Amino acid sequence: MKTGKTSTAAKFPKALLLGFEVGYLAIGGVKPQPINKWSEFKQVLKQLKDPKAHELYSNIIIDTADIAYDLCEKYICNQAGVSAVNELPYGQGWSKTSKEFDECLRSIPQMGYGLVMISHSQDKTFTDENGSEYNQIVPTLGNRPRLIVDRMSDVIGYAHPVEEEDGRTH
């Protein structure tokens, strides 16, 4: 069942949707820009510096931050000529990926745009210090990128669909 995360984000005024995953084709009222490579995202960031872009857009939507981070990681690997970030010695791959992801995302609000980042969620089971298990809804975004996203976020919200007796969801 869909929750409408992208549809909700698309209601932000003058929004540009950077579609790292396809799922925005039926959403009206928002300008979608497909992103298939990190270099394409970096090109969009350059274009957003233009004053004309500020006339068109006030808010930038990243859909999803999970895939954006994966593409960032691939970009760092390609730059270094390796197939996985852990092939770079002394944790350089992880630190370069985190730095690139952080700097690119932070550049959006630094240019004066609002930033909306979308991730999926999952229900995970944890164990407390007394050995009791409990469930918590957490983003599917990995720990490294989540630290970056959390630090930048003013609001973190979770959405889930509610089904009415007549079968409608909202």
Please identify what each model-predicted range represents.
Residues 7-9, 107, 148-149:
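Hydrophobic/aromatic ligand-binding patch that stacks against planar heteroaromatic rings
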Residues 62-92, 130:
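Conserved P-loop NTPase nucleotide-binding/switch module
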Residues 100-112:
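Catalytic-core regions built around general acid/base machinery
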Residues 1-71:
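Conserved P-loop
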Residues 54-59, 111-117:
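Loop/turn-to-beta-strand initiation segments
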Residues 84-100, 138-146:
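A short acidic, glycine-rich active-site loop
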Residues 115-170:
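Phosphate-binding/switch region of NTP-binding enzymes
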Residues 47-51, 71, 107, 152, ...:
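Conserved, well-folded catalytic cores of nucleic-acid-processing
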